[in-house]
Protein backbone atom coordinates (compact mmCIF):
# COMPACT_ATOMS: atom_id res chain seq x y z
CA UNK A 1 0.00 0.00 0.00
CA UNK A 2 0.91 3.65 0.23
CA UNK A 3 1.91 5.68 3.27
CA UNK A 4 2.66 9.28 4.11
CA UNK A 5 6.02 10.34 5.47
CA UNK A 6 5.38 10.99 9.21
CA UNK A 7 7.49 14.14 9.01
CA UNK A 8 6.06 15.45 5.75
CA UNK A 9 2.53 14.47 4.70
CA UNK A 10 3.17 15.75 1.18
CA UNK A 11 5.56 12.82 0.63
CA UNK A 12 3.84 9.53 -0.20
CA UNK A 13 5.72 6.26 -0.51
CA UNK A 14 4.85 2.67 -1.39
CA UNK A 15 5.41 -0.06 1.20
CA UNK A 16 3.94 -3.52 0.65
CA UNK A 17 5.51 -5.51 3.48
CA UNK A 18 5.90 -2.95 6.25
CA UNK A 19 5.51 0.81 6.54
CA UNK A 20 9.14 0.87 7.67
CA UNK A 21 10.27 -0.74 4.39
CA UNK A 22 9.68 1.65 1.47
CA UNK A 23 9.78 0.03 -1.97
CA UNK A 24 12.55 0.83 -4.45
CA UNK A 25 11.35 2.92 -7.38
CA UNK A 26 12.90 1.24 -10.41
CA UNK A 27 11.41 3.86 -12.73
CA UNK A 28 13.77 6.42 -11.20
CA UNK A 29 17.32 6.51 -12.57
CA UNK A 30 18.66 7.60 -9.18
CA UNK A 31 17.48 4.31 -7.71
CA UNK A 32 19.26 2.32 -10.40
CA UNK A 33 22.42 4.35 -9.89
CA UNK A 34 22.48 3.51 -6.18
CA UNK A 35 21.69 -0.16 -6.83
CA UNK A 36 24.54 -0.39 -9.33
CA UNK A 37 26.86 1.36 -6.90
CA UNK A 38 26.00 -1.06 -4.09
CA UNK A 39 26.45 -4.10 -6.33
CA UNK A 40 29.84 -2.87 -7.55
CA UNK A 41 30.94 -2.28 -3.95
CA UNK A 42 30.45 -5.95 -3.10
CA UNK A 43 31.68 -7.35 -6.40
CA UNK A 44 34.91 -5.36 -6.05
CA UNK A 45 35.38 -7.05 -2.67
CA UNK A 46 35.13 -10.53 -4.12
CA UNK A 47 31.46 -11.41 -3.87
CA UNK A 48 30.74 -14.08 -6.49
CA UNK A 49 26.98 -13.72 -6.63
CA UNK A 50 23.74 -12.58 -5.05
CA UNK A 51 20.64 -14.26 -3.62
CA UNK A 52 17.78 -11.90 -4.50
CA UNK A 53 14.74 -11.78 -2.26
CA UNK A 54 11.16 -11.57 -3.51
CA UNK A 55 12.00 -10.80 -7.16
CA UNK A 56 8.35 -11.04 -8.14
CA UNK A 57 7.69 -7.88 -6.11
CA UNK A 58 10.22 -5.55 -7.71
CA UNK A 59 7.03 -4.14 -9.20
CA UNK A 60 4.19 -5.24 -6.96
CA UNK A 61 1.76 -7.61 -8.73
CA UNK A 62 3.45 -7.05 -12.10
CA UNK A 63 5.85 -9.88 -12.84
CA UNK A 64 6.49 -8.71 -16.41
CA UNK A 65 7.86 -5.37 -15.22
CA UNK A 66 9.63 -7.13 -12.35
CA UNK A 67 11.38 -9.29 -14.93
CA UNK A 68 12.50 -6.19 -16.82
CA UNK A 69 13.96 -4.69 -13.63
CA UNK A 70 15.63 -7.99 -12.83
CA UNK A 71 17.19 -8.07 -16.31
CA UNK A 72 18.57 -4.58 -15.80
CA UNK A 73 20.19 -5.56 -12.49
CA UNK A 74 21.56 -8.83 -13.85
CA UNK A 75 23.04 -7.17 -16.94
CA UNK A 76 24.51 -4.39 -14.78
CA UNK A 77 26.27 -6.89 -12.52
CA UNK A 78 27.49 -8.95 -15.49
CA UNK A 79 29.36 -5.88 -16.73
CA UNK A 80 31.27 -5.84 -13.44
CA UNK A 81 31.80 -9.61 -13.22
CA UNK A 82 31.01 -11.71 -16.26
CA UNK A 83 30.68 -14.99 -14.36
CA UNK A 84 28.53 -13.64 -11.52
CA UNK A 85 25.86 -16.03 -10.25
CA UNK A 86 22.37 -14.95 -9.21
CA UNK A 87 19.54 -16.92 -7.69
CA UNK A 88 16.15 -15.32 -7.19
CA UNK A 89 13.26 -16.05 -4.85
CA UNK A 90 9.97 -16.09 -6.76
CA UNK A 91 7.41 -17.81 -4.56
CA UNK A 92 5.17 -18.93 -7.39
CA UNK A 93 4.03 -22.10 -9.14
CA UNK A 94 2.62 -20.13 -12.07
CA UNK A 95 4.82 -21.18 -14.98
CA UNK A 96 3.95 -18.02 -16.92
CA UNK A 97 5.51 -16.03 -14.10
CA UNK A 98 8.47 -18.37 -13.60
CA UNK A 99 9.37 -18.38 -17.29
CA UNK A 100 8.96 -14.59 -17.49
CA UNK A 101 11.47 -14.24 -14.68
CA UNK A 102 13.90 -16.60 -16.39
CA UNK A 103 13.69 -14.50 -19.55
CA UNK A 104 15.50 -11.80 -17.57
CA UNK A 105 18.62 -13.91 -18.01
CA UNK A 106 19.02 -14.67 -14.31
CA UNK A 107 20.97 -17.87 -13.69
CA UNK A 108 18.65 -19.52 -11.23
CA UNK A 109 15.32 -19.40 -9.42
CA UNK A 110 14.21 -21.39 -6.40
CA UNK A 111 11.80 -24.10 -7.57
CA UNK A 112 8.88 -23.57 -5.20
CA UNK A 113 6.58 -26.28 -6.61
CA UNK A 114 9.01 -28.81 -5.15
CA UNK A 115 9.71 -27.21 -1.77
CA UNK A 116 7.69 -26.74 1.43
CA UNK A 117 5.62 -29.34 3.26
CA UNK A 118 3.17 -29.45 0.34
CA UNK A 119 5.89 -29.67 -2.34
CA UNK A 120 6.71 -32.58 -4.62
CA UNK A 121 9.72 -33.80 -2.62
CA UNK A 122 7.93 -34.34 0.67
CA UNK A 123 4.74 -35.51 -1.04
CA UNK A 124 6.71 -38.21 -2.86
CA UNK A 125 8.36 -39.45 0.32
CA UNK A 126 5.09 -39.51 2.27
CA UNK A 127 3.10 -41.19 -0.52
CA UNK A 128 5.85 -43.59 -1.52
CA UNK A 129 5.44 -42.69 -5.20
CA UNK A 130 7.59 -40.48 -7.42
CA UNK A 131 5.28 -40.42 -10.44
CA UNK A 132 3.89 -36.93 -9.77
CA UNK A 133 7.38 -35.64 -8.91
CA UNK A 134 8.82 -37.06 -12.14
CA UNK A 135 6.07 -35.65 -14.35
CA UNK A 136 6.30 -32.22 -12.73
CA UNK A 137 10.09 -32.19 -12.92
CA UNK A 138 10.22 -33.04 -16.62
CA UNK A 139 7.69 -30.32 -17.44
CA UNK A 140 9.35 -27.76 -15.15
CA UNK A 141 12.83 -28.35 -16.57
CA UNK A 142 11.55 -28.22 -20.15
CA UNK A 143 9.66 -24.94 -19.73
CA UNK A 144 12.40 -23.16 -17.81
CA UNK A 145 15.06 -24.20 -20.33
CA UNK A 146 12.85 -22.94 -23.16
CA UNK A 147 12.70 -19.56 -21.44
CA UNK A 148 16.41 -19.48 -20.65
CA UNK A 149 18.68 -22.16 -22.11
CA UNK A 150 21.20 -21.54 -19.31
CA UNK A 151 18.66 -21.82 -16.50
CA UNK A 152 19.81 -23.74 -13.43
CA UNK A 153 16.80 -24.53 -11.26
CA UNK A 154 17.50 -24.40 -7.53
CA UNK A 155 15.82 -27.14 -5.51
CA UNK A 156 15.23 -27.20 -1.77
CA UNK A 157 13.10 -28.91 0.86
CA UNK A 158 12.17 -25.94 3.05
CA UNK A 159 13.46 -22.47 3.85
CA UNK A 160 13.31 -19.78 6.53
CA UNK A 161 9.68 -18.91 5.71
CA UNK A 162 8.41 -22.48 6.14
CA UNK A 163 7.97 -25.11 8.82
CA UNK A 164 11.01 -27.36 8.94
CA UNK A 165 11.07 -30.67 7.11
CA UNK A 166 11.61 -32.48 10.42
CA UNK A 167 8.06 -31.55 11.44
CA UNK A 168 6.52 -33.48 8.54
CA UNK A 169 8.97 -36.36 8.17
CA UNK A 170 9.28 -37.99 11.56
CA UNK A 171 11.18 -41.13 10.57
CA UNK A 172 14.91 -41.05 9.87
CA UNK A 173 14.55 -43.03 6.65
CA UNK A 174 12.03 -40.48 5.37
CA UNK A 175 14.43 -37.61 5.99
CA UNK A 176 17.20 -39.49 4.19
CA UNK A 177 14.92 -40.23 1.25
CA UNK A 178 13.89 -36.58 0.97
CA UNK A 179 17.52 -35.47 1.11
CA UNK A 180 18.53 -38.01 -1.54
CA UNK A 181 15.67 -36.91 -3.79
CA UNK A 182 16.40 -33.21 -3.87
CA UNK A 183 20.19 -33.61 -3.77
CA UNK A 184 20.14 -35.78 -6.90
CA UNK A 185 17.64 -33.67 -8.84
CA UNK A 186 19.37 -31.86 -11.76
CA UNK A 187 20.23 -28.28 -10.84
CA UNK A 188 21.54 -26.64 -7.67
CA UNK A 189 20.58 -28.00 -4.26
CA UNK A 190 20.14 -25.54 -1.37
CA UNK A 191 20.20 -26.81 2.22
CA UNK A 192 18.52 -24.72 4.89
CA UNK A 193 20.77 -24.80 7.94
CA UNK A 194 19.71 -27.52 10.37
CA UNK A 195 18.11 -29.72 7.74
CA UNK A 196 21.26 -31.83 7.60
CA UNK A 197 20.53 -32.70 11.24
CA UNK A 198 16.81 -33.28 10.78
CA UNK A 199 16.09 -30.21 12.90
CA UNK A 200 12.47 -29.47 13.80
CA UNK A 201 10.78 -26.11 14.23
CA UNK A 202 11.59 -24.64 17.63
CA UNK A 203 8.43 -22.79 18.58
CA UNK A 204 9.83 -19.86 20.49
CA UNK A 205 10.10 -16.21 19.54
CA UNK A 206 8.60 -14.34 16.62
CA UNK A 207 10.05 -16.60 13.92
CA UNK A 208 10.08 -20.21 15.14
CA UNK A 209 11.24 -21.73 11.83
CA UNK A 210 14.59 -20.01 12.35
Regions found by a protein language model. Name each.
Residues 22-28, 58-60, 164-173, 179:
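Active-site rim elements
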Residues 31, 66, 190:
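Hydrophobic (often cysteine-bearing) scaffold residues that line and stabilize catalytic clefts
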Residues 51-149, 153, 171-172, 180-184, ...:
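Active-site-proximal helices and loops of the catalytic beta/alpha 8
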Residues 156-157:
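Ligand-binding/active-site lining segments
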Residues 48, 189:
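Short acidic/polar active-site loop segments enriched in Thr and Asp
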Residues 1-45, 69, 73-79, 83, ...:
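Substrate-binding/active-site clefts of carbohydrate-active enzymes
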Amino acid sequence: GYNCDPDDSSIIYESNFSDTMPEWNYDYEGTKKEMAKAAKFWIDRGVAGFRLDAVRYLYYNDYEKSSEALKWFYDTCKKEKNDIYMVGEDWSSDMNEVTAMYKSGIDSLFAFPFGDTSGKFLASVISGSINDYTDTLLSYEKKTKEANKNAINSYFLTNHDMSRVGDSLTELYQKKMAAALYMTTPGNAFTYYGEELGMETYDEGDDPAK
